A protein has these predicted regions:
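ATP-binding N-terminal substructure of ATP-dependent carboxylate-amine bond-forming enzymes
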Residues: 1-168, 201-203, 492-532
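Short, charged, surface-exposed secondary-structure boundary motifs
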Residues: 96-100, 171-178, 286-288
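Active-site nucleotide/adenylate-binding loops and adjacent lid/helix of ATP-dependent enzymes
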Residues: 170-252, 257-258, 269-271, 298-322, ...
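Phosphate-binding site of ATP-dependent enzymes
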Residues: 231-288, 339-347, 400-417, 422-426, ...
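ATP-dependent carboxylate/phosphate-activation module, predominantly the ATP-grasp catalytic core
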Residues: 255-259, 266-319, 352-379
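A long amphipathic alpha-helix within ATP-dependent nucleotide-binding catalytic cores
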Residues: 294-342, 377-406, 411, 497, ...
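Peripheral (often C-terminal) accessory segments that flank ATP-dependent C-N-forming ligase machineries
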Residues: 380-533
Length: 533
């Protein structure tokens, strides 16, 4: 990576700083950053949402979200005092008061999100930033999406509390096969399936026939992003195309159904499982991602599920969440629910035992503003504070509140096979349409919480000037009010006219110098790909 800023980047940083300092964005009424410290912390149990709000608005413990970008939990600092971000990429070029990114970043070929986070934790600039004494003298708490045993060792040595389930447990639960078995134990059934190990196509067919799955099959390996480790096989040609990734390992073979994927996040607390809002998923749109079936965004809208389906899906999430508790898990997780569009059956899809890409929408809902963001319950679970909540009452209220809100996000990946060195990129901030209908940059913004209607959008830049864009690279995330996809008759979801306009408008603001693919190593490509969901 070339970290030398050009003129445009310097100008962007200067303009953003001026805009931030001249608005009330940093200190709006919901922003906990400006709240005063608690005068005396009581240790009696927190029993209602007002007490939870007060607890976090007067929090003195430094909490850091560490990651390639702050995307997943951006805006949580509005509720939680002393919550900030340590990131590899800084879309604000230094102007966000609670985003820290080291200035000196030599080129490194990262192979995973875990490697990025571990590099950040041991970076001297980051250690100096995080070692600043806190008013309370308490150890910093650290959250992130990707971590491993090495992350745990680093945090232990540096004196940080990693407020996440154990890496070993999460790795175990991350298996699609383990999820299927745990779900079956508590009546949270997956799409009709068999779990088998095969070495040839006929074995696959025999097992599918015995399981009543037919010949149009969906095959998944135990680990990996669903967009890259899910294979659609309906004949021997499909088998031969994917057999290298399938042979010799236990796999999940499912009947192919017409389904609508729905995402939901939840938090397993000592009082039970709290279920967040349900969202539809943007998957496999060729304009957004080069990966078939790959996740590329979410939508939350009233009709995402009927009331009956919402209750059944919520019950499925609670049952699986309680089962995870028996495994020793606690805290945040995400579940993909599949709704059979032919029968209205609700199936367990995948478990992501982590903060997910849907978190960005979860924390901005009407339910979050009426109560607190869902992630606040995760924080409580890892704080030394007792609490007693009626989880059933919270879930009932959130079902109603979340069903009335409307938000969408799309993750914009590079879809072209060409490799370019980015020379100009759009600014992070708030955009809107001008009189000619063009999408234009309006002002600096710290997050998307201030968006009011469908004429506005927030763009979070990930790759900027000096970075390479290549097929599959994450360019940025666009968040807006309103829907981004529609279903025409019985066909698959397609992007709306407005979504395509927003997407094209952002893409057109990227310019670059073409490079031959030989000039960019495969390892460099793998490094950037690891930052996907």
């Amino acid at each position: 990576m070339n970290n030398t800023p050009d003129v445009n980047t310097d100008r962007a940083a200067s303009d953003t700083s001026l805009e931030t300092s001249s608005t009330s964005e940093v200190s709006v009424g919901t922003d906990a950053a400006s709240a005063g410290p608690a005068l005396g912390r009581t240790r009696r149990p927190l029993r209602n949402i007002s007490e939870v709000r007060h607890f976090f608005r007067t929090n003195e413990v430094p909490i850091y979200f560490v990651g390639a970008t702050p995307f997943n939990l951006l805006g949580l600092d509005r509720w939680v005092r002393n919550f900030s971000y340590v990131t590899y990429y800084d879309g604000w070029d230094g102007a966000h008061p609670r985003v820290f990114s080291p200035k000196h970043k030599p080129y490194i070929e990262f192979s995973s999100g875990e490697e990025i986070n571990n590099w950040l934790l041991v970076n001297p600039e980051v250690r100096a930033h995080m070692s600043r004494p806190s008013p309370s003298g308490q150890r910093p708490k650290v959250a992130m999406v990707f971590f491993d045993a090495e992350t745990e060792r680093i945090c232990d040595e540096l004196g940080y509390d990693l407020i996440l389930p154990a890496a070993e447990l999460r790795e175990h639960l991350d298996s699609k096969l383990v999820t299927t078995r745990l779900g079956d134990e508590v009546g949270a059934a997956s799409v009709p399936n068999v779990l088998i190990t095969v070495r040839e196509y006929q074995e696959l067919l025999d097992a599918a026939t015995a399981g009543g799955l037919g010949t149009d099959l969906v095959v998944q390996t135990a680990y990996g992003d669903s967009g890259k480790t899910t294979f659609f096989i309906d004949d021997e040609t499909g088998w031969k195309r994917n057999q290298r990734d399938i042979i010799g390992s236990e796999i999940k073979v499912m009947k192919r159904i017409n389904n609508r994927p729905v995402a939901v996040e939840a938090v397993l607390t000592r009082n039970g499982t709290i279920v967040g809002p349900f969202m539809s998923e943007l998957t496999g749109h060729a304009q957004l991602t080069p990966y078939r079936g790959g996740w590329c965004g979410n939508e939350m809208f009233p009709e995402v599920l009927t009331e009956g389906l919402r209750r059944r899906a919520g019950d499925l999430v609670v049952r699986l969440g309680d089962r995870l508790g028996a495994e020793g898990y606690r805290g945040f997780f995400e579940i993909d629910v599949l709704v059979d569009t032919d029968t209205d059956e609700v199936y367990l899809g995948e478990l992501n035992p982590r903060i997910s890409g849907a978190s960005a929408i979860t924390n901005v809902t009407a339910g979050a503003y009426a109560d607190v963001p869902l992630f606040a319950f995760h924080l409580l679970e890892y704080f030394d504070v007792p609490f007693e909540f009626d989880v059933d009452e919270i879930n009932a209220r959130w079902r109603e509140l979340a069903a009335e809100d409307l938000w969408s996000q799309m993750v914009i990946k590079e879809t072209s096979s060409a490799v370019q060195l980015i020379t100009e990129a759009p600014l992070t901030g708030q955009y809107s349409y001008d009189r000619s209908g063009s999408l234009v940059y309006r002002r600096a913004a710290l997050d998307w919480h201030q968006l009011q209607n469908e004429s506005e959008a927030f763009f979070l830049r990930i790759y900027g000037a000096g970075d390479y864009r290549w097929k599959g690279a994450d360019l940025g995330v666009l968040v807006t009010k309103g829907r981004l996809q529609r279903r025409a008759n019985s066909e698959a979801d397609t992007l709306t006219i407005r979504a395509r306009h927003l997407l094209d408008s952002i893409r057109n603001q990227y310019t670059g110098l073409p490079l031959g693919s030989a000039e960019v190593s495969a390892a460099r490509v793998a490094r950037a790909a690891s930052m996907a969901k």
